[in-house]
A protein has these predicted regions:
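Short, Asp-centered acidic motifs that coordinate Mg2+ and/or phosphate
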Residues: 2, 72-73, 90
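C-terminal lobe and pocket-closing loops
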Residues: 79-145, 175-178
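Hinge/capping helix and adjacent helix->loop/strand transition within the periplasmic-binding protein
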Residues: 1-61, 108, 118-153
Length: 188
């Protein structure tokens, strides 16, 4: 996920957005107030000393959302704004690392001091699944994530594609639960 604005806005990063928003109304478009990227956006604003004048959930947040003026800043995926990437400002990346395709765009964590939580997907099995089945699923999943198609998708879309085994994933769930609690505390 990224935070983006029209190319003609006077802010190019979160510090500039914060400065601008202290004296001007800025509307945030997002996919829902309860999802992690939106919470990160609100927490960053709070840490940087401003509030969005208004915010609204949308079914779609793409180039048209910015060009139509429906929102001043949108919280969306890089893939949805890819067609107009050269015409907009990507203010920040919401995630652990900078996006390879946008190496000069700092993460929200770097810019606002909020934690670096990000959305991720995983492979889950029903409790009681035999170990040999879990091992086979893990073998296939790892091969797919490290394969050429997945790596090409990462380069094309900016999505982070990687493999974590069951132990690392379990640890990540615990760590991300703590990060989410930290975000919720900031937003209280």
């Amino acid at each position: 996920f990224v935070l983006a604005s029209s190319g003609d806005t006077p802010y190019k990063n979160l510090a500039e957005l914060a400065s601008y928003a202290k004296n001007n109304d800025v509307v945030l478009g997002h996919f829902g107030a309860g999802i992690v990227p939106t919470k990160v956006s609100f927490a960053a604003a709070k840490k940087l000393g401003f509030e969005f004048a208004d915010e609204s959930a949308f079914d779609m947040l793409d180039c048209n959302s910015l060009s139509s003026g429906d929102a001043d800043v949108i919280n969306t995926t890089l893939a949805l704004i890819e067609p107009c990437l050269n015409e907009i400002n990507v203010l920040a990346n919401i995630g652990e690392d900078r996006i390879g395709k946008l190496p000069n765009v700092a993460t929200v964590a770097e810019q606002a001091g909020v934690n670096n939580i990000e959305l991720w997907n995983g492979l889950f099995v029903k409790k009681g699944t035999p170990q040999n089945v879990k091992d086979k699923i893990a073998e296939i999943g790892k091969k797919a994530m490290l394969g050429d198609a997945a790596q090409a998708l990462m380069k094309e879309t900016g999505a982070r594609v990687y493999w974590q085994d069951a132990e690392a994933s379990s640890s990540r769930i615990v760590a991300d639960g703590k990060k989410l609690a930290e975000l919720n505390a900031i937003l209280q």
